[in-house]
Amino acid sequence: MLSTAAYRDPDRELVMGPQGSAGPVQMRFSPYAFNGGTVLAIAGEDFSIVASDTRLSEGFSIHTRDSPKCYKLTDKTVIGCSGFHGDCLTLTKIIEARLKMYKHSNNKAMTTGAIAAMLSTILYSRRFFPYYVYNIIEGLDEEGKGAVYSFDPVGSYQRDSFKAGGSASAMLQPLLDNQVGFKNMQNVEHVPLTLDRAMRLVKDVFISAAERDVYTGDALRICIVTKEGIREETVPLRKD
């Protein structure tokens, strides 16, 4: 028979008195939930890719198998969000509203770099009650080159060539470091990354992640940003 003595429910905590005696059981509400999922972005010379799985889960329950974590912001910019799904939806709605206001005021779309700076201020304004979201913005910059911006929950951000975030990021980031960044490798020719090779790499790493991470799976949604616009591609992943 399995023992439940070591199990601890974070929302139902036993409070001890001053002499170590057991006090009343208190119910504590947590405003956050972790809904899993993984996002990944790669920037090339004239393209950028952001990809995510479509599984939305909590603990050992799957809420839906069709919940992509990539959101189109402009014709040249896409954001990938993972973490607490409620915060993902709220944050993307705020960004979309700000982009509409900017377009009406300036008669042009906001650039990818400006969107990244705007998101940084939005996240910093909520630093005392932050959004439980890992954000990656990818798109094309003013020169038409691929750009990837990664953020922490309170607004610090930097531009990268590739980045992974979410539940399987610990597995994906070393693969990107090796295959895209050629880090810690000797006597290796640094070949420029092509769109075809980047697509194959994204599919391979997500298939591998779905084998090991219970929060990643069902399907892979890929958004490819080029000067022609944004196109999407869907690849099935394992569903167990």
Swiss-Prot record:
What the record says about the induction of its expression is: Up-regulated in prefrontal cortex (PFC) after nicotine exposure. Down-regulated by theophylline (THP) and 1,3-dinitrobenzene (DNB), two reprotoxic agents thought to induce infertility.
- Propeptide position ranges: 1-27
Positions carrying N-acetylmethionine: 1
Main localization, broad class: cytoplasm
> Can you supply a Gene Ontology BP term from the record?
proteolysis involved in protein catabolic process
Glycan attachment sites: 57, 208
Residues that bear N6-acetyllysine = 203
* Residues bearing the modification Phosphotyrosine: 149
Tell me the compartments it is located in. Answer: Cytoplasm; Nucleus
Q: Describe tissue expression.
A: Ubiquitous.
Q: What does this protein do?
A: Non-catalytic component of the 20S core proteasome complex involved in the proteolytic degradation of most intracellular proteins. This complex plays numerous essential roles within the cell by associating with different regulatory particles. Associated with two 19S regulatory particles, forms the 26S proteasome and thus participates in the ATP-dependent degradation of ubiquitinated proteins.
Entry protein name: Proteasome subunit beta type-1
Write down the species.
Answer: Rattus norvegicus (Rat)
Which classification does the entry list for the species? Eukaryota, Metazoa, Chordata, Craniata, Vertebrata
Give the encoding gene's name: Psmb1
